């Protein structure tokens, strides 16, 4: 269980910090979308966690 938790933390941290290494900027017209674009790499991790919540809801059938 601890290994799975560590893997999730590593994936979450790499998703958060990988975007800081990319120095591309959005055009001025899309500058208001910066917070959404910064959050986008984390979305697959949330789907991964949602799978565990779903399985817990159906009692891991």
Swiss-Prot record:
Subunit and interaction comment: PSII is composed of 1 copy each of membrane proteins PsbA, PsbB, PsbC, PsbD, PsbE, PsbF, PsbH, PsbI, PsbJ, PsbK, PsbL, PsbM, PsbT, PsbX, PsbY, PsbZ, Psb30/Ycf12, at least 3 peripheral proteins of the oxygen-evolving complex and a large number of cofactors. It forms dimeric complexes.
Record protein name field: Photosystem II reaction center protein K
InterPro entries: PSII_PsbK, PSII_PsbK_sf
Organism name: Gossypium hirsutum (Upland cotton)
Keywords: Chloroplast, Membrane, Photosynthesis, Photosystem II, Plastid, Reaction center, Thylakoid, Transmembrane, Transmembrane helix
Residues of the propeptide: 1-24
TM segment ranges: 36-56
GO terms classed as biological process: photosynthesis
Listed SUPFAM superfamilies: Photosystem II reaction center protein K, PsbK (SSF161037)
PANTHER family with a match to the protein in the record: PHOTOSYSTEM II REACTION CENTER PROTEIN K, PTHR35325
Homology family: Belongs to the PsbK family.
Localisation: Plastid, Chloroplast thylakoid membrane
Cellular component GO terms held in the UniProt record: chloroplast thylakoid membrane; photosystem II reaction center
Function of the protein: One of the components of the core complex of photosystem II (PSII). PSII is a light-driven water:plastoquinone oxidoreductase that uses light energy to abstract electrons from H(2)O, generating O(2) and a proton gradient subsequently used for ATP formation. It consists of a core antenna complex that captures photons, and an electron transfer chain that converts photonic excitation into a charge separation.
Membrane protein topology class: Single-pass membrane protein
Family matches, as Pfam families: PsbK
